[in-house]
């Protein structure tokens, strides 16, 4: 099955919004063993939409069209498809009744423009949208099935999972013997990872892919067929041997998700005292439901005064060593842990840039500490030539990895290929 995607909208084409739907879709389908082979972005111009529908329908088996199903004048997907097919738009009675009911239940008067959302090409199959006012539809043109979806992300994702996957599985039998494993890495560039793994001889049906999502690189091990799946453990063992400490999580979207799971399982508690990361540690954990079970507090102690008054950092420590130092960050972590007697506390203090660096402590210098009930671990890392946001996100990731290793009873401080440390 040859799958393609057409994304519509001037704001997407002009880069005014980031097309997260396309990235999510390609990843979702890959997990089902289907590769999206082409993606095209088209603006809100009727003739361009008609042309691309006609052209791609002769090459692809399935085309997902995203966007252009709203009630406004620049929502043109339905009209363009009808023109491409050479048939009229007709009102779908089921969806018209659904619209009437939706507006009545929500105590609103339906605008005349909303009636447009019940118009679909005459030969189209209506696709339900239980969470929005724009129905989807599927229509056959030339070789391809074109599957039209709303642009609103949560509507799009639900339609893909509940409607599109069953639709293509019924017609193309995509469900089969496929398996996907993901490994989240830290501290190694994509080319370095690829070089390290190039010695692996992959059996037929197994592929290795890479996806950069800073501060991590995700490695995907994909197998198709029973024979290939049976070889995955052996290939995974080679990946782990070659990459060593670079792998920080399995089948997780982020290191924060891994920490969340480990803290839930362990029953341990955590406090955070953040300076340069500015609450990023706490924020990433709080994005996961249930974090209240372990997160005692998240403190942004940005000024020296707050470090002293809130965390109990000694003024002489700041005078002698500075805010960005092993001594200061260790006292920050110890102070944060002591406030609520947490099992662990993470602390960060650094120079995220673009200014503020010195010869001894250039921009990208970050001190990180992990306080436990038995002691404190600390390191000061170098992150030169990174943006302010990347310095903060990398520092957060290193802090999380220190805690992860402590929770797994591993060495807390390890070497990373692209992240250097100051010697204590």
Swiss-Prot record:
SMART domains: MoCF_biosynth. InterPro entries: CinA (IPR050101), CinA-like_C (IPR036653), CinA_C (IPR008136), Competence-induced_CinA (IPR008135), MoaB/Mog-like_dom_sf (IPR036425), MoaB/Mog_dom (IPR001453). Belongs to the CinA family. This is CinA-like protein.
């Amino acid at each position: 099955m040859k799958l393609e995607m057409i994304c519509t909208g001037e704001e997407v084409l002009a880069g005014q919004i980031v097309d997260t739907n396309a990235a999510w879709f390609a990843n979702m389908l890959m997990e089902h063993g289907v590769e999206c082979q082409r993606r095209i972005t088209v603006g809100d111009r009727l003739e361009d939409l008609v042309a691309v529908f006609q052209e791609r329908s002769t090459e692809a088996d399935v085309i997902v069209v995203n966007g252009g199903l709203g009630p406004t004048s620049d929502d043109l997907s339905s009209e363009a498809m009808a023109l491409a097919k050479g048939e009229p738009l007709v009102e779908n009675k089921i969806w018209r009744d659904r619209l009437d009911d939706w507006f009545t239940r929500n105590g609103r008067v339906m605008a005349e423009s909303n009636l447009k959302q019940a118009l679909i090409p005459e030969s189209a199959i209506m696709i339900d949208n239980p969470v929005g006012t724009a129905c989807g539809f599927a229509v056959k043109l030339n070789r391809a099935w074109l599957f039209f979806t709303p642009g609103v992300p949560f509507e799009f994702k639900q339609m893909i999972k509940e409607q599109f996957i069953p639709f293509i599985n019924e017609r193309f039998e995509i469900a089969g013997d496929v398996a996907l494993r993901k490994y989240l890495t830290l501290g190694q560039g994509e080319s370095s990872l690829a070089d390290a793994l190039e010695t692996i001889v992959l059996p037929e049906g197994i592929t290795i892919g890479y996806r950069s999502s800073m501060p991590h690189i995700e490695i995907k091990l994909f197998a198709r067929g029973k024979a290939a799946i049976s070889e995955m453990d052996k290939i995974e063992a080679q990946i782990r041997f070659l990459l060593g400490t670079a792998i920080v999580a399995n089948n997780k979207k982020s290191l924060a998700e891994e920490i969340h799971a480990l803290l839930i399982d362990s029953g341990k508690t955590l406090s955070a005292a953040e300076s340069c990361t500015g609450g990023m540690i706490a924020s990433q954990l709080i994005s996961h439901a249930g974090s209240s079970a372990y997160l005692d507090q998240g403190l942004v102690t940005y000024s020296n005064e707050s470090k002293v008054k809130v965390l109990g950092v000694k003024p002489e420590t700041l005078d002698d060593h500075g805010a960005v130092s092993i001594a200061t960050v260790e006292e920050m972590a110890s102070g944060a842990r002591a406030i609520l007697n947490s099992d662990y506390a993470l602390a960060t203090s650094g120079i995220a840039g673009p200014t503020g660096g010195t010869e001894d402590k250039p921009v990208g210098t970050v001190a990180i500490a992990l306080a436990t009930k038995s002691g404190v671990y600390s390191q000061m890392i170098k992150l030169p030539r990174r943006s302010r946001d990347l310095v903060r996100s990398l520092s957060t990731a290193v802090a999380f990895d220190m805690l992860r290793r402590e929770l797994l009873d591993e060495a807390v401080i390890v070497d990373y290929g692209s992240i250097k440390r100051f010697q204590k």
